[in-house]
A protein has these predicted regions:
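Extracytoplasmic
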Residues: 59-64, 84-88, 120-125, 135, ...
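Short, internal strand/loop/helix patches
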Residues: 142-181
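Thiol-/selenol-based redox modules, centered on thioredoxin-like
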Residues: 179-217
């Protein structure tokens, strides 16, 4: 496995800062936690975002579990089908009630679609819920509309154990959705290694990664 470290894109940092300004600060969240009825369920996410300054790139091979998922249109598919085909795929993990990390990552996917332009139909974007018990297909569909998801960006839910199995397979399982961190995965085609980006990568960085990987392979 090889890794490089690069600074978080300024636009993403500003977006994250803006989201944080709309929510209680980490210190304030801790104060609220001790007050009846005033705990902030997203406090740990706020703390995570406040410490994210760099995105780290690594490459890895992941063994995909044989699990089923449910797409935002209600269609049952396997994980292999969701990630299959010979097109490049970009994957992340989100949940629809997240107010910190997920909106930033989903906005990045929105911008990535624009960055890809007429090549957008050749890249599959996949977002898998880490809160499948709450994220029904209808909720995912509404979330997709909120972020102007194109036809090649699909969101998936399913049984809790299947979501956890996928997260574990990608070494992204944190045990609690409130402890999740931003991580994005890119694969040019089946059989090739995944590029893993921990932290906030910009749409421009993801598009550049896709172009570089396709050129190499």
């Amino acid at each position: 496995m090889r890794a490089t470290t690069k600074a978080c894109h300024p636009g993403l940092a500003l977006m994250a800062a803006g989201l944080l300004s709309l929510a209680p600060s980490a210190a304030r969240a801790e104060d609220m936690a001790g007050m009846p009825g005033m705990s902030d369920p997203h406090a740990r996410c706020h703390q995570t975002m406040s410490h994210l300054e760099h995105a780290t790139r690594t490459t890895a091979d992941y063994a995909l579990p044989e699990v089923g998922l449910v797409r935002d249109d209600g269609r049952a598919v396997t994980l292999a089908q969701a990630l299959g085909g010979d097109r490049p795929v970009v994957l992340d993990f989100i949940f629809t009630t997240c107010t910190t990390i997920c909106p930033v990552m989903s906005q990045t996917f929105t911008r990535l679609q624009a960055q890809l332009g007429d090549q957008a139909d050749r890249v599959r974007l996949v977002s898998i819920s880490i809160d499948p018990e709450q994220d029904t297909p209808a909720r995912l569909a509404a979330y997709a509309r909120r972020f102007h998801a194109g036809r090649e960006w699909r969101l998936y839910t399913g049984a809790a154990q299947d979501s956890i199995a996928v997260q574990r397979a990608f070494a992204a399982y944190r045990g609690d959705k409130m402890d999740h961190t931003p991580v994005t995965f890119i694969r040019t085609s089946p059989g090739h290694r995944w590029v893993r980006i921990d932290g906030f990568a910009s749409a421009e960085e993801l598009a550049r990664e896709l172009h570089e990987q396709v050129a190499v392979h």
